[in-house]
Amino acid sequence: MDHRTEILDLRTALEVLRQTPGQLVETDVEVDPEAELSGVYRYVGAGGTVMRPTKVDGPAMVFHNVKGHPDTSVAIGVLASRQRVANLFGVKKEELGHLLCECAKDPIQPIVTHEPATCQEVVHRATDPDFDLFKLVPAPTNTPVDAGPYITLGMCYATHPDTGCSDVTIHRMCIQSKDELSIFLQPGSRHIGAMAERATEL
């Protein structure tokens, strides 16, 4: 089945997984984001191992009852296997590389709109008096030795201080304080690395 016209966002992606047998498990049982949440996923979704590469095509999970974060859900493992990604794109697993090449050759150009964006319905600013990342984001601490809670698929929008060119990159982001995140930048590997180097010089 071709899902490419159906999937518009995370919600519709999860709906496709709900309709695919064995690809999504949802729970309302309370879990602690401190090591417990990832521990449950390790056994349900990853077959009891975190060794790479995992050969188990276990289900993605959605936790609807995260301790300390009422009315917030956490999705984990949505892109954890090539087969699941292929299902979401409506292609065979072996065709993913070709699909990526096709998309790079014929990209969909962005549409600029001045209408209110759905993703901007709720906006939190660091200048808000009660702003606190620890309270706003149900980011899990995956092991007792982790540096802190991690947003594992965080998107970082950055702009070069000289050229004004911008880029969006995906990173694991560690919450360090109520208004600070840290990310690892490998020197020279991405545009954002050059942006950070230049910003550090200023």
Regions found by a protein language model. Give the residues of each.
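Extended, highly charged
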Residues: 1-202
